[in-house]
Design a protein with these regions (language model features):
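Glycine-rich beta-strand-to-loop/alpha-helix junction loops that act as flexible
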Residues: 1-3, 28
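Beta-strand/loop-alpha-helix module characteristic of Rossmann-like adenine-cofactor folds
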Residues: 8-18, 22-167
Length: 167
């Protein structure tokens, strides 16, 4: 699997360097995100979705809406600013865990997900309590998925009034 524009900075950089005399076509492919929706069986339109690269989330104080689906890619590489390595940066991972536990309860269920690499193989889907994030078996392919908190989903009273006026 793989999409040429998803976690593919070198390819996008190469495309940006081409001049207009070279015609290029970027064909879509199936990404981890597509596999995630199918394997975990959820619709991102239900509650919305937020997705972040783990290191981007760590560095730039991204705001998470707990009422939406949250996907944090490359959680096993968080804090790695160099070449991919199988060594986990537990200090960075624990920092993310702390940020997430401030938003969710410690026992909030989350999933470590890895899409199947080849046809006929199975994805890795491991459910756990968020407070156990630093105890999960992670690789460079690991994605963290946190389902939405239904309790926090409250429709806007102004929008409801508007819709009642329109209908």
């Amino acid at each position: 699997y793989g999409h040429p524009c998803v976690f593919a900075t070198p390819g996008l950089l190469a495309l940006s360097m081409l001049d207009d005399s070279i015609k290029t076509v970027v064909c879509p492919g199936i990404s981890t995100q597509d596999c995630l929706y199918a394997d975990l069986r959820f619709d991102p339109a239900s509650g919305g979705i937020q997705s972040f690269d783990a290191t981007e989330y760590l560095l730039y104080d991204k705001v998470v809406d707990p009422s939406s689906h949250v996907v944090i890619y490359q959680i096993g590489m968080v804090g790695n600013l160099g070449l991919p390595t199988n060594k986990i940066n537990f200090e960075a991972l624990n920092f993310i865990k702390k940020k997430l536990i401030e938003l969710y309860k410690k026992e909030k269920k989350a999933v470590i997900y890895e899409a199947a690499l080849y046809p006929g193989t199975h994805p890795k889907i491991s459910e756990f309590d968020l407070e156990q994030l630093d105890r999960q078996e992670l690789t460079t392919l690991s994605t963290l998925y946190i389902p939405p908190d239904k309790i926090q989903r409250m429709p806007s009273s102004d929008a409801l009034r508007l819709l009642n006026q329109v209908a």
